[in-house]
Amino acid sequence: MPQKPSYLFVSPHLDDAILSCGGLFSYLAPKTDVTIATVFTEAHNSPTSLSIRRFLKNSGYDDSEKLFIERRREDKIINDLIGVKTIHLRFTDGLYRLKSNANRLELALGNILQEAKFIYPLFAWQLKMGKVSSNDGQLINEITRKIEGLVGPKTVLFAPVATGSHLDHKIVRRAIEGRFENVIFWSDFPYNVWDNQFSSDLGSRGYQRWEWNNNLDEKIKLIRMIKTQVSLLFPDGNIPKVPEYYFAKEGVVPFPATVGGLKPLAKEDQYSESQEGDQRL
């Protein structure tokens, strides 16, 4: 009997797979093996920065390690509820990543101003710029090696297309794109809604966009269970109900025929190739 495919969603953060793919994987989970491997699951209390203190205040916490313990616990509870396997890869979140090759001046400055110790000291501004630091080059290779250990011959691999150009999302895409075959990329929600950007640069690379409309009400229920983040992402309590979008190479049907509801978009609806955020990848 042929082996059934398994599905591996590589999520940058502890909420991203649910936000972008919750409709699809909650549909798949009762039918086959689904795993969410979250990359950036760790934080620390010292050193700290203004960006970290602001993030903690907005989250209602005063301790980064306790916040991330709760986020990991929350993630596993939600995944267990729908029958999805949870893997935390234990890399440090971009907000908290420190320079490993700081020069003497940076080390001295770090004793006065702790921000100098961080790869992204002005995190909110650097996030908008979308430029991945060369300090994260080795990190990308380490993530690739971790994913290689999770991918089998029948694994269907999903990754973010990095809509919105979040640095950690771009790092995960770089760790996967071109290093694994037939990867399916997802459009990052809610960045795609905020930026009105439902396309990507992948059209010029032979990818087709697919639309998924099933289980969206279930997905919104799952998002509301992410108590540590939902009020930050949706302060007015309104979670937009929009289709999920996936990008797969033309000629490759992303899922077995038993999966209903997935449809390729017409050619004229496929892409706008001038998406500025994706072109920075």
Set out the residue ranges of the language-model regions:
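Active-site rim/loop-helix segments in enzyme catalytic domains that contact anionic ligands
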Residues: 1-131, 148-151, 181, 266
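C-terminal accessory domains and tails appended to enzymatic cores
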Residues: 2-4, 29, 81-83, 100-150, ...
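Divalent metal-coordination and catalytic microenvironments
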Residues: 13-15, 75, 157, 168, ...
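Short catalytic/ligand-binding loop motif for oxyanion handling, primarily in non-cytosolic enzymes
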Residues: 17-19, 43-47, 94-103, 165-169, ...
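A structural signal for well-ordered alpha-helical segments within the folded catalytic domains
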Residues: 19, 69-73, 145, 167-170, ...
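Generic beta-sheet signal
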Residues: 37-39, 186-189
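Active-site rim elements
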Residues: 61-65, 162-163, 206-210
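Short N-terminal targeting/anchoring amphipathic segment
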Residues: 151-163
